[in-house]
């Protein structure tokens, strides 16, 4: 299934190109956007999710909710969608606490990641994990 993403340069400027992230080989200086969420409840507990066993990368591994931004999606819109899809939670009042780049020309794996932090009122019972994630 195709999933289209926007291409950015190293300064995070949109390059006016949209590509299929599953088939496109990223060239030097081309990046896609990923987002991750640190979700902390009011008791100071953090939510991590376990990846499905059939995932191509890190099957069964533990991770923070997140994923790739879709075409025309801002970083903030992407993290809201990803958290909702993966946990059933609606996030508000978050902010970026860290960003980094990965440029791996050997594997054509170029991306930048925005990591958000959200402190919110939720319990384990509120979390509704997505089976496919």
Region roles according to the model:
Residues 11, 52, 116:
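Anionic group-transfer/hydrolysis microenvironments
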Residues 29-31, 61, 108-112:
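A generic structural micro-feature
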């Amino acid at each position: 299934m195709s999933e289209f993403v926007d291409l950015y340069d190293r300064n995070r400027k949109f390059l006016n190109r949209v590509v299929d992230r599953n088939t496109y080989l990223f060239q030097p200086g081309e990046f896609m956007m990923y987002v991750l969420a640190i979700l902390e409840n009011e008791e100071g507990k953090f939510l991590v999710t376990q990846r499905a066993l059939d995932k191509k990368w890190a099957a069964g591994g533990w991770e923070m909710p997140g994923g790739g931004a879709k075409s025309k999606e801002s970083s903030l819109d992407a993290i809201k969608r990803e958290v909702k899809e993966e946990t059933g939670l609606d996030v508000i009042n978050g902010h970026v606490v860290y960003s980094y780049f990965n440029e791996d020309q050997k594997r054509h794996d170029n991306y930048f990641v925005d990591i958000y932090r959200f402190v919110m009122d939720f319990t384990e019972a509120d979390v509704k994990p997505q089976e496919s994630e």
